[in-house]
Amino acid sequence: MYAQRLLDNLDPREHEVHVVLSNYAQQVVAEELPGGLRLAPGVKTHNIKSMNAPFASGSNPPDAMVVIPCTMGTLGRIAHGYSEDVLLRAADVALKEKKKLILVPRETPLSLVHIKNFELLALAGAILLPANPSFYAGPKTIVDVVDTVVARVLDHLGVPNALAPRWSEEKD
């Protein structure tokens, strides 16, 4: 649901939007999104095994990249520079080219290994944005809760949004 709400709020007419789904992400989509992932016209998709995506090269790095949600396995592989598929390669490129890389893990609790991987990624310049929703605005639906996290991702991407009330804003 996090990925869907992010995609719902990235207009491919204003932003170049690419989607890569890992095998596990495809399972998550099947379980969490009845009807599958909805993509707006203009969103480009890439096979996880295809290394021909334009953003898989330092000569054409992405402006920004979001892995949402991000498993601890993926986070660990990114932290240690493994690039066996296009998702991991693109993350590696984003880090080495000093582009914005936002990772949105939702797993809990964290082990020391996870925390050390967080540390490595933070030192490398990644933005670690755990999927910890806020409740101060009194969300009424699951989508409202998810949107508190997605709004923060959009903020870090520099994409204006009104998905969730800001601290001290009036509630509707």
Regions found by a protein language model. Give the residues of each.
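A cross-family phosphate/adenosyl-ligand binding-site feature
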Residues: 1-102, 106-172
